[in-house]
Amino acid sequence: MANKNTSTTRRRPSKAELERKEAIQRMLISLGIAILLIFAAFKLGAAGITLYNLIRLLVGSLAYLAIFGLLIYLFFFKWIRKQEGLLSGFFTIFAGLLLIFEAYLVWKYGLDKSVLKGTMAQVVTDLTGFRTTSFAGGGLIGVALYIPTAFLFSNIGTYFIGSILILVGSLLVSPWSVYDIAEFFSRGFAKWWEGHERRKEERFVKQEEKARQKAEKEARLEQEETEKALLDLPPVDMETGEILTEEAVQNLPPIPEEKWVEPEIILPQAELKFPEQEDDSDDEDVQVDFSAKEALEYKLPSLQLFAPDKPKDQSKEKKIVRENIKILEATFASFGIKVTVERAEIGPSVTKYEVKPAVGVRVNRISNLSDDLALALAAKDVRIEAPIPGKSLIGIEVPNSDIATVSFRELWEQSQTKAENFLEIPLGKAVNGTARAFDLSKMPHLLVAGSTGSGKSVAVNGIIASILMKARPDQVKFMMVDPKMVELSVYNDIPHLLIPVVTNPRKASKALQKVVDEMENRYELFAKVGVRNIAGFNAKVEEFNSQSEYKQIPLPFIVVIVDELADLMMVASKEVEDAIIRLGQKARAAGIHMILATQRPSVDVISGLIKANVPSRVAFAVSSGTDSRTILDENGAEKLLGRGDMLFKPIDENHPVRLQGSFISDDDVERIVNFIKTQADADYDESFDPGEVSENEGEFSDGDAGGDPLFEEAKSLVIETQKASASMIQRRLSVGFNRATRLMEELEIAGVIGPAEGTKPRKVLQQ
């Protein structure tokens, strides 16, 4: 029988078993070190005292702090390693304390020339005698830090350097940055200064009031003394000048009583004429008819009407930003692109990382990585601004985990707009947290577009509220068009409205035409007076009022607000577009400005002519890059969050700016509207009233109930050409297909053309 060679094979341990074994070893070593540190901390026996003195030899009198820190690290090392800046901050603070303790030891025992020997002597004495009584300074590590520091900055300077290290370490450990602390102190100083100025003004007002009361009291006393002196004088005969006796005074005849009649006050009427302006025109005179009015006792709304701002805690974002910086650099490195993140700005809704590419890196390589960056950062979407205007950096905008709401009150307090500029409006906060405002008179018209629920209507309400906060009814007038009937109807009956909010789309085109007529009237007025714009005319009025007793009223600005342009374009596209184009071309100098809002940013609503005449645009979140290009002529709006954030592209900038719009609640709007209604009643201007329209008038635009106003022109065209087709009428009369079809039906009813015969052309019955 052959002997079988039996061999035992040892199974290799798996990776999990090795890791478990290493973990057990680490745990046992950590437990042993922890036990030794506890013996040293409580100085248990000769071993504990010896261990404590050995630690003192290294770190001096900071041994307890070192033991406590080591114990925490042994038990929580996994959590500590994840906290960026915690270890480095602790070591920086510890180094500062070592410097200060060692400097104090040198000063106390006069160890200027023998720092090392003196420090060793303090610890060795206790070590050999099993004591822990003497002060050990900063130990050997403290000596190593103290000697070069004292050589450079002296013993006193060492205290200063140690304090700086403690401060820097505290900043590294804390969740706040230097910018946050500086901003905190600057805000505190600003509040203190504001309170100081307010108290100073109050003291000045009180002093003025006291001085006024004192002057009034002195004048009253002086008047009483004068009256008393006059009463003491004897009566005098007015004809002879002789002093009358008491008997003569009693014999004077009684004075007959007369009824007092209230005088009739006649308000003067005058035309505004300037003597230096000569009228050489042979045209019909243009009457400048402004009746003088009494000063309007009107109080502007206060910020107290709006809900106070709730504090926002974005400390969590700072921790995420530090992690994202590492992820960004690692992601770019994985694609072979070398970049450095220069800085990160935390905004209300997004954080902007400013990235500097290395020399030779093409910008489009970074721009094409937006989806990969969104994947790496686990972000909803990433918007890349390449490059940042005015900087040699590329901006990467990443949504925040928590969006901080910007309240209307907060934005208004930070914007610091000029009170005399009624149309300077705060729009939102930029990524760096600064408030951004725009001047509507310079835009001069604004297009606001975005999908449903993206914040468009809230932004329009914020713009209206901003104007109402600064302007009286005689300074700014509104014409509001709201086909949805729910967005702007709350503003009905405020004194700033020219007419009630227009909710009928059929009336809207007529209302816009009334504004066009007002624009033409104003230009005729400017030509009559000899000025170029509304500012020049109002300056003339002010000059005239200062020189004449007949007071004239300056022209108010007119702001036309259309909340849903798409509805108007569906009903009367040609008339609405013509009115918008005319206003866009000429209305700026006349003081008339438009704000057009739509939730359907397509080319049939925002036509090329409208875009050409409304150069300033605001884009909220849209569904596609096509819609973004329709609004802004470039992509970007499809990357927005849809939480009130927007891309603002004013007329004077080539690239859009990302802003977080302010939130104004319905309660805030109602409070400011109710306050304004208590100040003055609505005073509508009948000249802007579009009047009543019939059911089919909107279909025929400017026509009456009897038919289309182009009927006669279409009839002449058909008889002249002896051809009748909807496409010909549509092409020759520049009307839509639906209107051309209705004209064909009217021509058939009138007997001009025959009925349709399938694919054959209609017969023309009249010659």
UniProtKB/Swiss-Prot annotation:
Essential cell division protein that coordinates cell division and chromosome segregation. The N-terminus is involved in assembly of the cell-division machinery. The C-terminus functions as a DNA motor that moves dsDNA in an ATP-dependent manner towards the difSL recombination site, which is located within the replication terminus region. Required for activation of the XerS recombinase, allowing activation of chromosome unlinking by recombination. It is a multi-pass membrane protein. Coiled coil: none annotated. This is DNA translocase FtsK. Consists of an N-terminal domain, which is sufficient for the localization to the septal ring and is required for cell division, followed by a linker domain, and a C-terminal domain, which forms the translocation motor involved in chromosome segregation. The C-terminal domain can be further subdivided into alpha, beta and gamma subdomains. The alpha and beta subdomains form the DNA pump, and the gamma subdomain is a regulatory subdomain. One of its GO terms (biological process) is chromosome segregation. One of its GO terms (cellular component) is plasma membrane. Homohexamer. Forms a ring that surrounds DNA. ATP binds at G453, S454, G455, K456, S457, V458. SMART domains: AAA, Ftsk_gamma. GO terms for molecular function: ATP binding; ATP hydrolysis activity; DNA binding; DNA translocase activity. CDD domains: TrwB_TraG_TraD_VirD4 (cd01127). It comes from Streptococcus pneumoniae (strain ATCC BAA-255 / R6). Keywords: ATP-binding, Cell cycle, Cell division, Cell membrane, Chromosome partition, DNA-binding, Membrane, Nucleotide-binding, Transmembrane, Transmembrane helix. Belongs to the FtsK/SpoIIIE/SftA family. Residues 685-705 are annotated as: Disordered. It comes from the Bacteria. InterPro entries: AAA+_ATPase, FtsK/SpoIIIE/SftA, FtsK_alpha, FtsK_dom, Ftsk_gamma, P-loop_NTPase, WH-like_DNA-bd_sf, WH_DNA-bd_sf. Gene3D superfamilies: 3.30.980.40, P-loop containing nucleotide triphosphate hydrolases (3.40.50.300), Winged helix-like DNA-binding domain superfamily/Winged helix DNA-binding domain (1.10.10.10). Pfam families: FtsK_alpha, FtsK_gamma, FtsK_SpoIIIE. It is found in: Cell membrane. Residues 433-629 form the FtsK domain. Residues 685-702 have a biased composition (Acidic residues). The chain crosses the membrane at residues 28-50, 54-76, 85-107, 127-149, 156-178. Residues 179-767 are cytoplasmic. Its main location: membrane.
